A protein has these predicted regions:
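Intrinsically disordered, low-complexity, mixed-charge
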Residues: 1-101
Length: 101
């Protein structure tokens, strides 16, 4: 079984944890811009251990595109790894925003 949902399989939820130098480098704002441009809803936040968590819902293809840019990040970031999984979208979000715990 693949970690990627089949294209055209409707809305899904992506939960990702981004590891590396991802705090203090504009990573959350970068994710916000990308997610809004892709029409996704959800949030991004810093974790106390230095990682960044992303929870996004939307079209499968757009989530996969967001996942690809999470591996890159903004210029000042250094992404070491991205752990992620997909699940069923709940539709609970109306927009994408930055959360502060």
């Amino acid at each position: 079984m693949s970690d990627f949902p089949a294209a055209g399989s409707g809305n899904k939820r992506l939960n990702a944890i981004v590891y590396g130098r991802v705090q203090g480098v504009g990573f959350r704002f970068f994710v916000l811009q990308q997610a809004v441009a892709l029409g996704l809803t959800g949030w991004v936040r810093n974790l106390v251990d230095g990682m960044v968590e992303v929870l996004a819902e939307g079209d499968t293809a757009n989530l996969q595109e967001l996942l690809a840019v999470l591996h890159e990040g903004p210029d000042a970031a250094f992404v070491r790894d991205v752990k992620f999984h997909y699940s069923v979208a709940t539709g609970e979000f109306r927009e994408f925003d930055i959360r502060y715990h």
